């Protein structure tokens, strides 16, 4: 399957962001000896929300009730272009590339807030 990924790049919270194709971007980064695309992750089990991504303009992607780490590439068609961007909201400012400042979410958790999620699929 051939897919084109367009990844959001942003140096810091004050810089203007831009979209770039992952294959071209990665080739340029490797050739220049620069760091890879920055993104946040935590559990990789679909319960933490650390990914904080939008896929094709949809939070976590086009499937309902799943997170980005649960999104299977097989749902896309050969030749699709996939836009991968960070959540861009006042409460979650972009730190760099695909990583956002989740301290607002962390404050809710520290105050005792939680979300119950069934991860077994039943």
Predicted regions and their residues:
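Signature of N-terminal electron-transfer/Fe-S-associated modules in redox systems
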Residues: 1-122
């Amino acid at each position: 399957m051939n897919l084109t990924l367009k990844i959001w790049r942003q140096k810091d919270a004050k810089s203007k962001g831009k979209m770039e194709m992952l294959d071209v971007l990665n080739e340029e980064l490797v050739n220049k000896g620069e760091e890879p695309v920055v993104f946040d992750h935590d559990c990789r089990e679909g319960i933490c929300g650390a990914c904080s991504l939008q896929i094709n303009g949809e939070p976590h992607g086009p499937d309902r009730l799943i997170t980005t780490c649960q999104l299977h590439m097989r749902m896309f068609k050969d030749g699709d272009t996939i836009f991968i961007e960070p959540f861009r909201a006042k409460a979650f400012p972009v730190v760099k590339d695909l990583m956002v400042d989740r301290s607002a979410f962390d404050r809710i958790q520290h105050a005792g807030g939680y979300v119950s999620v069934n991860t077994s699929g039943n």
